[in-house]
Amino acid sequence: MEIRVFRHDDFEEVITLWERCDLLRPWNDPEMDIERKLNHDPDLFLVAEVAGEVVGSIMGGYDGHRGAAYYLGVHPDYRGRGIANALISRLEKKLIARGCPKINLMVRGDNDAVISMYEKLEYEMQDSVLLLGKRLIEDQEY
């Protein structure tokens, strides 16, 4: 397995991966999300590759105050092999190198498997907060 920075020729493979991992939502256009990421810290967009196939991804961000991780997904046939842990670990190292003191994650409350995985990596529930959002630019429905 190789963890590397996303390349433009990974585009379709990553979107297919996200579909298989049920990461897509109708209000987020994955092509636009990738294009936006490629314009802002593209080296924090990582993929895991096995035998030439993209089998995992994570999209990281750092705003100078906190780090974040999005679009963590591993192909169902490759789960349980440490790929998600490797992606998170590599992102954490990249964030630490930038001086990032903390990473925050958003996980759906009913996603027990992912919550458990993060807890094994020493992530813990923080103060209960309500996530508010406001769409500034409407994506076309995917």
Curated annotation (Swiss-Prot):
EC numbers for this chain: 2.3.1.-
Pfam family, one: Acetyltransf_1
Assigned keywords, A-Z: Acyltransferase, Transferase
Gene3D superfamilies xrefs: 3.40.630.30
Enzyme superclass (EC): transferase
Gene Ontology MF annotations: acyltransferase activity, transferring groups other than amino-acyl groups
Residues spanning the membrane: none
Location of the N-acetyltransferase domain: 1-142
SUPFAM superfamilies cross-referenced by the UniProt entry: Acyl-CoA N-acyltransferases (Nat) (SSF55729)
Domain of life (superkingdom): Bacteria
Family the entry assigns: Belongs to the acetyltransferase family. YpeA subfamily.
NCBIfam families named among the record's database cross-references: PRK03624.1
Protein name: Acetyltransferase SG1711
